[in-house]
């Protein structure tokens, strides 16, 4: 029995070492930045446009529409608009250069995605029709899609009340569900030491599997690694190398998916979850009032040190 057990343990260890030895890095960005020229003619170190784009979809409605036509921001009642200097017009209306907001800055510690209040003139230029949508922020979407692998992000979360950073995946077929949430953070109030993670399968495959996980450290105080191990059989989430959650892989998640990183602000889940105000989508005045309560917390940054995808 001992010999057999030793053989099993040794074999498992050997296979794990082989995985470490032969795992191939198929995507990597440590955000050193490239010198990118914008439509305005300005040049700046920026996330590599060959690796990332800055909205949910290429070439479709900007900046608030999801792949199947659902208006995602309105669905969540989020209070930000995702923008970039590459966004020069909306619905054929030109955005003046001096009103364009740029949420991305590369510094020594990584890529900063900054959320801040927009001026009234900026909100008009970005056609933010909802009275509560007062913030400008940023989103990254990987141009490449992936099928299985180890997906890692090292990041430091913002402390600002109402912030809702996320690292997640959606199918390359641009449908929803399914969705894999590697983390959703609200590193303030009662969730300062927790993050939310899990999966949302297709409706025919069962209920969403997600929960808050307490990791015992304030996620806004330092950088931490959030990792997903994704195989045809199982999906597992890790925090700083320790497994936190596990789920069987639904059939809808056995196909290529792309990566999203974003910094959302407010919305009914965030406000209700953290008790700013009782919020629902039928009362936009409440969302506007919530914005007034949290607005002194901004600008605030999500800082990303690296994103790496390795083969299994």
Please place each PLM-identified region on the residue numbering.
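Classical Sec-dependent N-terminal signal peptides that target proteins to the secretory pathway
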Residues: 2-23
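GH16 jelly-roll
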Residues: 23-312
């Amino acid at each position: 029995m001992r010999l057999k057990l030793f053989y099993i343990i040794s074999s498992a260890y050997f296979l794990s070492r082989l995985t470490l030895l032969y795992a191939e890095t198929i995507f990597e960005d440590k955000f050193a930045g490239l010198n990118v020229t914008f439509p305005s003619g300005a040049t700046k170190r920026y996330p590599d446009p060959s690796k990332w784009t800055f909205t949910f979809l290429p070439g479709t409605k900007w900046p608030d529409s999801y792949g199947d036509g659902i208006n995602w921001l309105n669905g969540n009642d989020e209070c930000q608009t995702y923008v970039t200097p590459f966004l020069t017009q909306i619905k054929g209306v030109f955005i003046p250069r001096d009103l364009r907001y740029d949420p991305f800055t590369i510094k020594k510690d990584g890529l900063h995605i900054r959320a801040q209040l927009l001026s009234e003139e900026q909100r008009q230029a970005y056609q933010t029709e909802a009275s509560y949508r007062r913030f400008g922020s940023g989103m990254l979407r990987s141009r490449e899609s992936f099928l299985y692998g180890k997906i890692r992000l090292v990041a430091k979360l913002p402390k600002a009340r109402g912030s809702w950073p996320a690292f997640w995946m959606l199918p390359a077929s641009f449908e929803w569900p399914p969705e894999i949430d590697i983390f959703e953070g609200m590193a303030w109030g009662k969730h300062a030491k927790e993050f939310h993670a899990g999966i949302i399968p297709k409706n025919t495959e069962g209920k969403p599997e997600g929960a808050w996980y307490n990791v015992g450290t304030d996620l806004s105080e330092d950088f931490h690694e959030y990792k997903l191990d994704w195989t045809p059989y199982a999906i597992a989430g890790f925090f700083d190398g320790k497994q936190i959650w596990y789920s069987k892989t639904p059939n809808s998640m056995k196909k290529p998916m792309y990566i999203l990183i974003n910094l959302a602000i407010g919305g009914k889940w965030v406000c209700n979850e953290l008790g700013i105000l009782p919020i629902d989508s039928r009362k936009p005045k409440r969302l506007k009032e919530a914005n007034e309560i949290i607005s002194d917390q901004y600008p605030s940054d999500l800082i990303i040190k690296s994103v790496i995808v390795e083969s299994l």
